[in-house]
Swiss-Prot record:
Compositional bias annotation for Polar residues: 1-10
InterPro entries xref list: DDX47/Rrp3_DEADc, DEAD/DEAH_box_helicase_dom, DEAD_box_RNA_helicase, Helicase_ATP-bd, Helicase_C-like, P-loop_NTPase, RNA-helicase_DEAD-box_CS, RNA_helicase_DEAD_Q_motif
Organism in which the protein naturally occurs: Scheffersomyces stipitis (strain ATCC 58785 / CBS 6054 / NBRC 10063 / NRRL Y-11545) (Yeast)
Annotated spans, Disordered: 1-61, 460-484
Binding site for ATP: A115, Q116, T117, G118, S119, G120, K121, T122
Protein name per the record: ATP-dependent rRNA helicase RRP3
Enzyme class at the top of the EC tree: hydrolase
Ranges where the Helicase ATP-binding domain occurs: 102-273
Amino acid sequence: MAIVGSNSVSKKPKHTKRNDARDLAEKIKRNALKKQEQDKKQQLEEESKPESSQKSKNIVEVNPDDEVKFSTFSELKLVPELLEAIQQMKFSKPTPIQSEAIPHALEGKDIIGLAQTGSGKTAAFAIPILQSLWEAQTPYFGLVLAPARELAYQIKETFDALGSTMGVRTVCLVGGMDMMDQARDLMRKPHIIIATPGRIMDHLEHTKGFSLKMLKYFVMDEADKLLDLEFGPVLDKILKQIPSKRTTYLFSATMTNKIEKLQRASLHNPVRVAVSSKYQTADNLIQSMMLVSDGYKNTYLIHLLNEFVGKSIIIFARTRAHTQRTSILCRILGFSAVPLHGDLTQAQRLGSLNKFKSGTANILIATDVAARGLDIPSVDVVINYDIPTDSKAYVHRVGRTARAGRSGKSISLVTQYDLEMYLRIEQSIQKKLPKDPSPPKAMLDALHVHVDRAYAEAIRQTKEFHEKTRRGRRGKDDKDREEH
């Protein structure tokens, strides 16, 4: 028997790389679930705390099925030019968030709007601002902050449409675009500025002659996302650069401790309008899942795309690499697919969105940057290629379909490694989702041969893409941070 000396170290049995990776994955999953439980417990504790009398007096709780405060926009005594634009946009009746928020906003009050994506919240803050702008017609009248570039462009489109008969000038300031071009746009004295926090701060610090000392309206859209992306320090700087005497709107999907602190720092005696504070999915959304083997995940995806030929589809992946690789795979196999993720240039991202919205491409493969706030109409199917890490992200994803009263379908591809997380999502949304049947094994095996061959080529092309991207970005320093 070998004797181990006092200075020797006893060696542990060796594990295979596969077991190490599996153990690490299980550890990460356990930690994520533990953190989720802690966050949920903290949220419940915060919700159970009594609210101050001042806050209670100003809270207006609204459910989507509640009777609206006004049934037509003509009841609001808006200027004719704004009413004409609203009619051109075919806004037949106000949504609950519009019904509750707009009357308070027209009275000049600060607003906290708690509403999910697709609730009509952009118009809820744009209409009061444009109504007030008609009376003033001053430059740099309103500033809207958004956490993501695409969302900023979507907000600009809404302001452009609502202000089309009023001569409203808007500018969108986001990272990835030329600073000098944006500075020239600012010198044209736009009425409304829509921006990501990092880029507007760049201009406040470096663009000669530009300031927001005359600003009248300040909007933080998707404020929870702004804070999740750690824009807090930049927001503090912006708040110091704008007048304290202003009207402020804060819109968020959820009310967190961070939002409470931001509200206290930036709003004065606000009215809080809450449409829905729970994680809910639309009643007209058909949700289901498919249990798939991890090695056959791409094959199941292609099978589904064959089943939904001609439909408008959004596929959600967890990472930029998955998104790029899956879009290449789909194109190799003959599908009209475009990617949307943070490694694309701004022009490429806008190009993908425009192709999808126009119908030139019927499949959009995206990271969660596309899940919130973007105006993508008439999506028939949402496929969760990768299961999201929490129920909130799941609800935001599947909320891209079944909007404005239309029906929709969502399918989640669940591997053995995703099952525990998926069960947590079911528990949170309080729905047991049906399991879709798998295709016949012979059909799946035959399809797998073609998919596997295409996947190998997709991996090669994805590596080339990322190498080219790294070379192109070397030396650049973009201060804007956003979820990719």
